[in-house]
């Protein structure tokens, strides 16, 4: 199974079958990956977004693009030593004709302010930029989400505009 590894984390992209299993029984999906059962503390708004993404994006898009599923799936953020999922990260699709893709991430509240999100975002952006077809990665966050904004800037994303109540950041290939 393909995964990315950083100092403390594994980033595991979920296949279509694993996403389907996750929708049915997250604990069974974690067990299949050899992970300990997680008990994530996630903001209810993000839970709704995750359920919507699973049903209306990740599952159908990984089925439609099996050869490029890495660009359309959730990557579990896993603590290597503890074998524990603490969040998710990924892209909203294969880079467009301008070489642009978008990333998003979520981390269990129990693991905020420990550098895990920075490590995961750095790892996945480095992986994306290793593909010649990627020139720009964008990320969007709400104007009031200061921790996310700070994280994006620490990883090298720069403010690039605003769309309604969302701030847009981008990072260019160096």
Predicted regions and their residues:
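GNAT-family acyltransferases
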Residues: 1-102, 107-110, 123-127, 131, ...
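Conserved hydrophobic beta-strand within the GNAT/NAT acetyltransferase core sheet
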Residues: 136-141
């Amino acid at each position: 199974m393909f995964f990315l590894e950083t100092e403390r984390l594994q980033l595991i992209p979920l296949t279509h079958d694993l996403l389907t299993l996750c929708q049915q029984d997250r604990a069974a999906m974690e067990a299949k990956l050899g992970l300990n059962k997680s008990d994530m503390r996630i903001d209810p708004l993000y839970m709704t977004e995750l359920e919507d993404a699973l049903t209306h994006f990740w599952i159908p898009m990984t089925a439609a693009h099996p050869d490029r599923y890495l660009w359309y799936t959730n990557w579990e953020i896993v603590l290597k030593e503890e074998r524990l999922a603490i969040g998710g990260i990924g892209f909203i699709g294969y880079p467009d004709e301008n070489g642009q893709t978008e990333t998003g991430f979520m981390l269990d509240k129990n693991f905020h302010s420990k550098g895990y999100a920075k490590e995961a975002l750095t790892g996945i952006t480095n992986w994306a930029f290793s593909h010649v077809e990627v020139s720009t990665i964008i990320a969007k966050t709400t104007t009031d989400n200061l921790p996310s904004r700070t994280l994006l800037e620490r990883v090298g994303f720069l403010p690039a505009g605003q769309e309604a109540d969302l701030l847009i950041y981008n990072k260019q290939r160096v």
